[in-house]
Amino acid sequence: QVVSIIGGILTAIFFLGFLVVASIIRTETSSLIIGCLFIITTLTISRRLTVPFLDAMNITLYIAGCALIAYGLNKSTNALFIALAITGIFTFFLSKGFILPFLSVILFIISFLGELAYLSSSIQLLQIAVVPVLAVFLFTNLYERDILTGLKENLVSKYTPFHSGLFVSCICLLAGLSVNYGIPAPYWLLSIFIWIGILLIIQ
């Protein structure tokens, strides 16, 4: 899965470069339309075929589609993050397999925090926004058996990519906040919640 994701990301970069060089993408509107077509194509392939070797192609089209949608909405940051969050939600429930639901969880969380960062540049708000993500990840770890028992049969397959997406998102969020650790800010807010989570896990 890791190799497929890395390969898909690299292919998406080269593919986007080709679209730019070939002048296929000339305006924000064309970028938005092509991006939506890529997302729809990816979801269609994912629902009809779950062949492993198609994972890399789905990743390529999905990442390229999200990047094109972001470029098409770059003049409206608020609409950009909302559109990406909605894309993540639809992808999670409409796609099959592991890769796309996994990426959709990461996309939704990034869009959610990006929207908060756009609305407020306060580091305190971002710390508070990280707490629900960490809390959901902690909850899924503590009550994994109960969650799997209570889920409907068609949603059980979504648990693994959901949990994996939360795990990767938590690592990226904590790493991202630590980059600006030298800037004076009340980081003790996030530290308190992290210690509470550790104590709950120990118990």
Which residues are covered by each model-predicted region?
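Alpha-helical multi-pass membrane segments and their bilayer interfacial helix-loop junctions
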Residues: 1-203
